[in-house]
Amino acid sequence: MLYFFLLYVKKKYILDRYEKEKKVIAYYVNNNERIMEQSNKALHEKYEFCNIRRDEIEQAVKIEAICFPPNEACTYEHMVPRIENAPDLFLVAVDRKTGKMAAFLNGLATNREHLTDDFFTNADLHDPAGANIMLLGLDVLPEHQQQGLARELMEQYKEREQVKGRKKLILTCLPDKVEMYKKFGFKDHGIGDSVWGGEAWNEMDIVLE
């Protein structure tokens, strides 16, 4: 069955999402014509953006192990309950040519205001009605980098959660990634409470307006 709905996300554009078999494809609509910036159009032609499926857990764990060192990467033990508790907060990009996952962005909902290390290991902290999202990982395989995939995942995530009424997205990152997230619209609040993996992490957030 095909579901159709329109979401006003920009003054000029309407986001026209079609959901089929839990897969989401996005187009921008203006004056009843489907349009999309060329960069986005190219990405959507190459990748399918959708919520993760249960049978993709192994892929997600392997990608996490490639993108993060062992002291930081989410293990299978913690990835499974994260996906089971909040599959709608696990956005993936699937390479249309290979059918394999190329990247993902995931998180948990909560009313808490700061990202602490327990979110990385305890998916039961997820509150479906939570006002904020703790982003727990943005992973892009090396061979799929340098084409705007991380930015596109983040933009789609922001739009999805804003429509749901979320207030903020919150993340932690190492200092060398702060500038990248600033370009995505996040505000840096300096070193936060997290010491995940024995590291000092900057806490950043973005208000969804």
Predicted feature locations:
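Conserved acyl-donor/pantetheine-binding loop and adjacent beta-alpha core of acyl/acetyltransferases
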Residues: 98-138, 145, 155, 195-200
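Cytosolic beta-strand hydrophobic patch enriched in CBS
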Residues: 90-95
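Helix-loop element at the rim of GNAT/NAT acetyltransferase active sites that forms part
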Residues: 62-75, 82
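Conserved catalytic-core motifs of GNAT/GCN5-like acyltransferases
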Residues: 109-112, 170-172, 182, 187-203
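A short beta-loop-alpha structural element at the N-terminal edge
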Residues: 46-60
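Polybasic, lysine-rich low-complexity intrinsically disordered segments
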Residues: 4, 11-13, 20-23
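Conserved GNAT acetyl-CoA-binding A-motif
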Residues: 154, 161-173
